[in-house]
Amino acid sequence: MFMKSKAAGSEFDGAVAKDNVNTRLKIAQFMSADPNATADVPQLKLETPTAFKANGEVDTWGPLGSGTAFNDVVNVRAYSVKNSDQPRVMRYFLFSLVNIDKDGTWSDVRPAAGLYEQDPGYVTPGVDPNNKGQGQDSGLVSLDATGLEGDVYLQVVGLDFNYNRVAYLVPLKLNRTKAASEVVAPTNVRAIAYTLSTRIDYLYKTQDPVLDAPTSGTNLWVTTSWDAPVTLSGYRGFRVLRSTKAEGPYSQVAFAGEAQCAKPADAKATTRRCTVSDNTASLITDQDYFYKVVAAGTNEATSDVAPTHTLPIFQPKLLSPGKDVHDVDLTPNYTVKLNLFQTGATGAVMNLRVADFITGESYAYAAKRLTVRKELGETQILSNLQGTSNYYVFRDSYATDNDPKTNNDTVTYDAASDVLTVPHQFEVDYLGGNKVPLQANRRYSWYIDSGYAYRLADPSKPTTAANNYIAAYSVYSDPSDTVRVVPGGVKQGGAEVNDFTTRQ
């Protein structure tokens, strides 16, 4: 157990002992909700069913001991016990199966439910008599074997309402009872990297990132996916391998079973899509990675290589109107230093907003779906012009094509200064309409509501090239609770906001 000032407690209970294997663990620590409250970590009891009723419900429970053997599925529960003057109220329990390979690389997979959140207003009595029925119980949690066999580990993490954290690592024996058969290599493998602009940091409050500095940790992961046969009855599972070079060597970073594969699209489907993420702590940004997927049965079959390149943090900087400035024109230009192409990105997609400061609910202007990209040897800017299709509003070639129709006086990008300029309501001007100016002597807020940088699988080829999908995202902001602008991403807030006041 260790402590930082005003931080909650954190404790790891377990060990990894393998011949000639060095394993390093990074123990997370949260800032406490109340620095004056207890920093003692919660204590959990771990149990496994010893008997089931005829209807499948658990009849009796017994302690989960080191080396307990399971067949195909790991059935466990966790509940809190009293270890201080008050019963512990929990935020969540987390369960995962862990594999540690010969190189000491830790990889884990969680059940579909992921976190098992606890209701602070409701406690489920635990069975510990010293707890007097005031503990919190996860109930039965079943973890599929997901491609594992032999010596594995169960990780159980508990977080209480002062952000005190405890983690248990229990060695288990996992037996596979179903018959294996010959398997075929996974096909159509893709590896898509995700970087968040705001790191999910459990130990310290985040600082402004250094844009060209490699980062690692919980703001970075790679999602791998592949096609597998509809019928997986003879499969023991899949192993996901990673290397920094196409020729290897490769290390296992994730694993999957049928639980990680979607249902077939319809009755005529011959394949199903499987997905699992590489969340290992050794991932860093601005790095080439290569992935393979191995199917395991009575034989092993390995897929082709899928490349990706993890992007650094994408942090566009708002320039003008500046923060808290006055006397701004009623049809201003909004300028942004992109900090984009030097990161290795192919382009970026952004939604710019100008909000009424007083009501906070309406937009005075919304530039939707601006795409800035490098393609065919030039910088291009596209916009959906408030519709559904993208149109070119800027190309480097416009400056030299001697075509009066392409004289660009709308959105521009200056490569020397890396500055994007977006005139107020440029879409209206572009389409020959009349702009609606901002109101005089009024306060507004402007910001990039949602935006991300992206990199194609082969940046040297155009977007329309075969299989040239987006292989990496760096998410600046994706704040919606319901709709993601980044496929497969997570909610990401914290966009920079500049407030300004218009002229009289």
Swiss-Prot record:
Residues that make up the propeptide removed upon maturation: 1-212
Name listed for the protein in its UniProt record: Uncharacterized protein DR_A0282
Species of origin: Deinococcus radiodurans (strain ATCC 13939 / DSM 20539 / JCM 16871 / CCUG 27074 / LMG 4051 / NBRC 15346 / NCIMB 9279 / VKM B-1422 / R1)
